[in-house]
């Protein structure tokens, strides 16, 4: 078994053993529990090993990633955890990493924010055919989650995440652009997106919103920070957890998010694709992260005849209409709602993969949602 110290920048957190398959097998020593990732620490070594593995699995390429089987064959590894282990668990979403026991490495020497990184793994996901590449283990692409193909790229000194769509319609990149433009019209804090065409396929680009001084904390690690009371709703419990962690501005952020998700029929707002930003040095929460990862929306997985129907929703209720009922204040620009259908139409119309009927049906469905949203919000104030 290999031995590693999980680090937060240059602060040692815990010494562990890891299997050849890339998973944590045992906790050997705890150093600085106060600097652990949110929601992970317990002084029970066995439970801590389980929690660390849960955390570790959240930062490796998921089994659902398009093209993963080919990548594992190409790199001759049994699991994506091995790829992340080879890159020392480094990420562009936070400052945690694996330091081999006995190593003199520092965070300054290995982090991907200020050092170059390999593009080989990310590019391999997008190549139709490839001979086995020379394996450079240092890449943040080994620590990116989500099922769509993606890669980190640097353009003019700025680090971007590039993400593809799913065949045959490749709609998700266009959805990201449309959702960002809708959020802009509603004055909702969001990550900006732009579209590029690479090898005749659309990709959406968004700049990294995390820096060397911050970390992204997914809502997934916040929601269980307290035990849930039988009297608490899922939404109420989540707010209570955020209050316990002293995260500012949560209620308003969630209400804005629910308005956007209702408008664009976001069917994939799981606890991993929204969350909060924490100061990596003081470990104090700074507030909500800008909204991102809105691509699985606008009925992108529905037939033309199904566009406009209500799809299963998450995370607080099972439909967008029920989630909208959680909104108690109008915290968006209500005058911007009227423009949203046209914003969506103009964006999706640029795709050569979406027929005119589909674009029309989607924009009309957004128009119906816009009228419903405006009517609901106008009654609140």
Predicted regions: what is each one?
Residues 264-265, 270:
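Extracellular C-type lectin-like domains
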Residues 1-259, 263-264, 277-381:
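Phosphate/dinucleotide-binding and metal-coordinating scaffold of catalytic cores
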Residues 270, 275-277:
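Conserved protein-kinase catalytic-loop segment immediately C-terminal to the catalytic Asp
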């Amino acid at each position: 078994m290999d031995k590693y110290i999980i680090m937060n920048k240059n602060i040692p957190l815990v010494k562990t053993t890891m299997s050849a398959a890339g998973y944590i097998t045992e906790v050997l020593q705890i150093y600085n529990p106060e600097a652990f990732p949110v929601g992970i620490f317990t002084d029970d070594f066995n439970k801590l090993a389980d929690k660390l593995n849960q955390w570790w699995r959240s930062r490796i390429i998921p089994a659902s990633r398009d093209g993963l089987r080919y990548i594992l064959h190409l790199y001759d590894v049994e699991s994506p955890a091995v790829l992340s282990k080879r890159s020392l668990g480094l990420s562009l979403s936070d400052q945690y990493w694996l330091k081999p026991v006995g190593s003199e490495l520092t965070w300054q020497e290995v982090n991907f924010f200020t050092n170059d990184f390999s593009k080989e793994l990310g590019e391999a996901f997008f190549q139709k055919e490839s001979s086995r590449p020379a394996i450079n283990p240092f890449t943040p692409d080994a620590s990116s989650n989500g099922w769509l193909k993606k890669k980190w790229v640097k353009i003019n000194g700025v680090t971007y995440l590039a993400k593809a769509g799913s065949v045959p319609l490749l709609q998700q990149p266009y959805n990201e652009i449309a959702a960002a433009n809708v959020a802009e019209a509603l004055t909702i804090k969001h990550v900006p997106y732009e579209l590029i065409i690479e090898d005749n396929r659309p990709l959406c680009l968004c700049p990294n919103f995390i820096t060397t001084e911050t970390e992204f904390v997914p809502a997934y690690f916040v929601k269980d920070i307290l035990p849930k009371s039988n009297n608490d709703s899922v939404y109420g419990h989540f707010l209570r957890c955020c209050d316990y962690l002293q995260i500012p501005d949560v209620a308003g952020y969630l209400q804005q998010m629910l308005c956007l998700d209702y408008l664009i029929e976001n069917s994939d707002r799981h606890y991993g694709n929204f969350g909060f930003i924490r100061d990596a040095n003081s470990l104090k929460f700074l507030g909500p992260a800008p909204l991102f990862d809105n691509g699985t929306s606008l009925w992108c997985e529905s037939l033309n005849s199904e566009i406009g129907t209500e799809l299963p929703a998450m995370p607080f209720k099972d439909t967008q209409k029920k989630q909208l009922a959680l909104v108690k204040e109008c915290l968006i620009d209500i005058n911007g709602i009227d423009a949203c259908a046209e914003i969506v139409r103009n964006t999706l119309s640029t795709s050569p993969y979406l027929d005119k009927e589909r674009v029309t049906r989607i924009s009309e469905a957004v128009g119906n949602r816009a009228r419903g949203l405006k009517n609901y919000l106008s009654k609140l104030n």
